[in-house]
């Protein structure tokens, strides 16, 4: 059965990009079903207005409770009963790969609420949102792009969505580390060579090299991740070799 994903958005046109690439193929294969609902369709105000000035004053506009609540209620009625409603905002918990794996494993319908303007009426968040997530400590013009990023990351974890079964497993962060470097033909170009070990055909040595590079890249670029990973004695040896090769103390 297809995973049902929904998006509440004032700009459904933005979401069309999700029908291309990996996510688009997953939709075509019937692995995922994606629907959008526009709160303007439930607005009773002139010109389908869905925003109003914030109580207490201040800049910007706030998306009103009534049309947004009606859109959420309608969307949930068309999705599975165990549908989870997610609001994407800078105030949410920053999502990590492990969070995405847990969410994907639940195989639960997900309804994403994409905010705009100064945000949405707080009563929606407190009474009609199950989880609040953020992509990081920065602000976007709306939640549509964040929802698409979230959905793309979820779809990659669905079996059959990628061309190779090992692609998602090898992604950065899947095992707590950054991915190893990748090369393709030609073996030499502009004086730059592919590492010999990748050309030799010794799969055991290739696996060892990739693990060492993964550990090393994590040490160079995201050392904070190493503090959260339990390294084996072999991992520690490989990391020590990498550090020595890159001018660190041997």
Curated annotation (Swiss-Prot):
Pfam family, one: tRNA_m1G_MT
Catalytic activity: guanosine(37) in tRNA + S-adenosyl-L-methionine = N(1)-methylguanosine(37) in tRNA + S-adenosyl-L-homocysteine + H(+)
Known EC number: 2.1.1.228
InterPro entries from the UniProt entry: Alpha/beta_knot_MTases, tRNA_m1G_MeTrfase_C_sf, tRNA_m1G_MeTrfase_TrmD, tRNA_m1G_MTases_N, tRNA_MeTrfase_TRMD/TRM10
Residues noted as binding S-adenosyl-L-methionine in the record, renumbered to the chain: 115, 135-140
GO molecular function: tRNA (guanine(37)-N1)-methyltransferase activity
Subcellular location: Cytoplasm
GO cellular component, as recorded: cytosol
EC primary class: transferase
Gene Ontology BP, a term: tRNA N1-guanine methylation
Family matches, as PANTHER family: TRNA (GUANINE-N(1)-)-METHYLTRANSFERASE
Family: Belongs to the RNA methyltransferase TrmD family.
Protein name from the UniProt record: tRNA (guanine-N(1)-)-methyltransferase
Organism: Legionella pneumophila (strain Lens)
UniProt lineage: Bacteria, Pseudomonadati, Pseudomonadota, Gammaproteobacteria, Legionellales
Gene: trmD
